[in-house]
A protein has these predicted regions:
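Acidic helix-start/capping segments at beta-turn-to-alpha-helix junctions
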Residues: 33-53, 66-88
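Low-complexity, Gly/Ser/Thr/Pro-rich intrinsically disordered linker/tail segments
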Residues: 151-183
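...with weaker cross-activation on analogous glycine-rich loops/strands in unrelated enzymes
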Residues: 13-18, 76-157
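Active-site-proximal alpha-helical segments within enzyme catalytic domains
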Residues: 52-55, 59, 125
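Second-shell loop/turn segments in exported
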Residues: 38-47, 89-93, 114-117, 164-165
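Sec-exported extracytoplasmic/periplasmic mature domains
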Residues: 22, 26, 57-65, 72, ...
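Active-site-adjacent structural segments surrounding the nucleophilic cysteine of cysteine proteases
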Residues: 10-50
């Protein structure tokens, strides 16, 4: 009975993230990778702008989870564990949570790392997936509770340049990360 209750609670949380992500697709957002100075905690770039990471940040924020704060606090304590891709010597609460490699490190440390596979059944609503688009360009999205037209896999809410959209793109690029995070 305990296992059943635990599983049900987990599924509810995942479904809430899926619903939050789908809700984001109702709003017009222009892809804009600009650096913004934002408030802290609970800071966000202008609501009509964003990138792939902002989809994840905004969906979790709808659940009361502030990834800006959580990533920043973890980076303050564990800066050496995070990627050094940008040559920074200290944290930056305006941008750190908006970088895919930083979110991958955070989810690896604080969430659950799941198998990276080519099997659609390994990906369930509420999962976070990261891809390598090409040449080291990374991307992130959320698996949601909507199936593809052929009913073979769940779809993804992400922003790869056309705003916050729902697409069948799970296996379009090389998967480099697969996580769940429930705080």
């Amino acid at each position: 009975l305990f296992f059943f209750v635990k599983l049900s609670f987990s599924q509810i949380k995942e479904n809430r993230l899926s619903i939050a992500a789908l809700e984001l697709t109702k709003y017009k957002v222009t892809y804009d990778p600009s650096y913004f100075s934002i408030s802290y905690p609970n800071g966000d770039v202008p609501s009509d702008k964003g990138v792939c990471t902002d989809v994840v940040i905004r969906a979790y924020r709808k659940l009361g989870i502030d990834l800006q704060k959580e990533v920043h606090e973890d980076m303050l304590k564990n800066f050496s564990l995070y990627p050094k891709v940008w040559g920074l010597k200290r944290t930056d609460k305006n941008i750190d949570h908006r970088r895919v490699p930083n979110l991958m490190t955070f989810f690896s440390r604080k969430g659950t790392v799941s198998i990276k596979s080519k099997k659609s059944e390994d990906y369930i609503p509420g999962d976070i997936v990261c891809w390598n688009l090409h040449g080291g360009i990374t991307h992130i999205g959320i698996v949601v509770n909507k199936k593809t037209k052929d009913n073979k896999r769940y779809m993804i809410v992400h922003n790869i340049g056309n705003g916050q959209v729902l697409e069948d793109c799970l296996f379009d690029f090389k998967i480099i990360g697969h996580y769940s995070y429930k705080n």
